[in-house]
From Swiss-Prot:
Keyword tags: Cytoplasm, Exonuclease, Hydrolase, Nuclease
GO CC annotation terms, alphabetical: cytoplasm; exodeoxyribonuclease VII complex
Biological function: Bidirectionally degrades single-stranded DNA into large acid-insoluble oligonucleotides, which are then degraded further into small acid-soluble oligonucleotides.
Protein name as annotated: Exodeoxyribonuclease 7 large subunit
Any one GO MF annotation of this record: nucleic acid binding
E.C. no: 3.1.11.6
Organism: Synechococcus sp. (strain CC9902)
Residue ranges of the TM segments: none
The protein's enzyme class: hydrolase
CDD domains: ExoVII_LU_OBF
Catalytic activity: Exonucleolytic cleavage in either 5'- to 3'- or 3'- to 5'-direction to yield nucleoside 5'-phosphates
Superkingdom of this protein's organism: Bacteria
Protein's GO biological process: DNA catabolic process
Entry's family note: Belongs to the XseA family.
Length: 387
């Protein structure tokens, strides 16, 4: 190659040319997966080294973006950086300008385990401290993003299950570095629980990646939840998602809708239960009335048997029977049938001819009077011998 065809640059020109090539040949934005090393803030800007173990590159978050980050990386964190290249022509240096930094799943899980272990050691995470939920809460405080599909589902479920409970909706941010904001809301609500008649708290968020749910692993937030004066129910993400907030709550539900189901009784089931109880009460009352009626009848019958009037009636009946018997045996009844009663002068009743002699005077008593007669002949019966 001839010398006149070889380009000649000054250092500044060369660096500028390199910068132009980078601008034309590289994406204006990209995702970079890396591990953070030696992060430090200088003059309000966050400087850090991004490495994958085999190579490294400098990175920076300008102060204007740093305040907007939802996550502040620490040394050793795995991250995904949304960035673009910055080339400084004066020194021919390349830096990744981070527009956003998100924790990698491994970082989220590592921080989760660290917080969980600390809170377990202190007894903050302890199933034994969980409080039971009110059966029919007067007021439920719903902390979630507004508007959101999660809130819409919760309100619909509340109306369907138990419309008598007042639902107090309190908007909160649910993603990013918002733990401090949620804590402030919780503290204000804790001070007004009595005034607002709040019986329970539902902390809810719809689905998202595990990284999106990282705010609910915040240690300070979870300590605040554990100290809340009313039972706390969480419905964060989906069934497979688990956060530290779920572990410190009094009840963990798989979804926001499931959280409402856990807090509120079912109106239809309650109605059926009430009807069943009413029927059982009617049956019991009816049985007791019938039992007491039978007892009353038995006692009434017993009293009848033991009453003076009943006794007098029994004596009267007995007297009547004896009177009838005496009447049946009375001589007058025999006289009425045509028979006669014979007696001697001494008034002694004569039962046979053996005590009568010829010439004796005999009185014959008949039904309508008496006859005095003298005995002329005595004729004993043939089967009796004469003395």
């Amino acid at each position: 190659m001839s010398a006149d065809r070889v380009p000649t640059y000054s250092v500044g020109e060369l660096n500028t040319a390199i910068g132009s090539l980078l601008e034309r040949g590289f994406a204006p934005r990209f995702l970079l997966e890396a591990t953070v090393s030696r992060p430090q803030v200088k003059k309000g800007h966050l400087w850090l080294t991004l490495t994958d173990g085999t190579a490294s590159i400098s990175g920076v978050v300008w102060a204007s973006r740093l305040a907007q980050l939802s996550y502040r990386p620490t040394d050793g964190d795995g991250v995904t950086v949304v960035g673009k290249l910055n080339f400084w022509a004066a020194r021919a240096s390349i830096t990744v300008q981070a527009l956003d930094i998100r924790p990698s799943l491994s970082t989220v899980l590592r921080q989760f385990e660290q917080v969980r272990q600390r809170l377990e050691d202190e007894g903050v995470i302890n199933p034994g401290r969980q409080r039971s939920l009110p059966s029919q809460p007067a007021t439920l405080a719903l902390l979630t993003s507004v508007p959101s599909s999660a809130l819409a589902d919760m309100l619909r479920t509340g109306r369907e299950r138990w419309p008598m409970t007042r639902l107090l909706v309190i908007p909160i941010p649910v993603q990013g570095a918002v733990a401090d904001q949620i804590i402030k809301v919780l503290n204000r609500l804790a001070e007004r629980c009595e005034a607002l008649a709040v019986d329970g708290l539902v902390l809810a968020r719809g689905g998202g990646s595990r990284e999106d749910l990282a705010v609910f692993d915040d240690e300070a937030l979870c300590r605040c939840l554990a100290q809340f004066p009313r039972p706390v129910v969480t419905g964060i993400g989906h069934e497979d998602d688990l956060t530290i907030a779920d572990l410190v709550a009094d009840h963990r539900a798989a979804t926001p809708t499931a959280a409402m189901v856990a807090c509120l009784p079912d109106r239809d089931s309650a109605k059926r239960n009430l009807q069943d109880r009413r029927q059982r009460m009617k049956d019991v009352v009816g049985w007791r009335i019938e039992r007491d009626r039978q007892r009353l009848n038995d006692r009434r019958a017993f009293l009848r048997q033991q009453s003076p009037l009943r006794r007098l009636q029994q004596l009267q009946d007995d007297l009547n029977r004896k009177r009838d018997l005496l009447r049946a045996l009375s001589p007058s009844r025999w006289l009425q049938r045509g028979l006669a009663l014979l007696s001697n002068d001494a008034g002694e009743t004569l039962s046979g001819v053996t005590s009568i002699k010829v010439g004796d005077r005999v009185v014959i008593q008949m039904n309508d009077g008496e006859l005095d007669t003298d005995v002329k002949v005595v004729r004993p019966s043939s089967h009796q011998s004469m003395s």
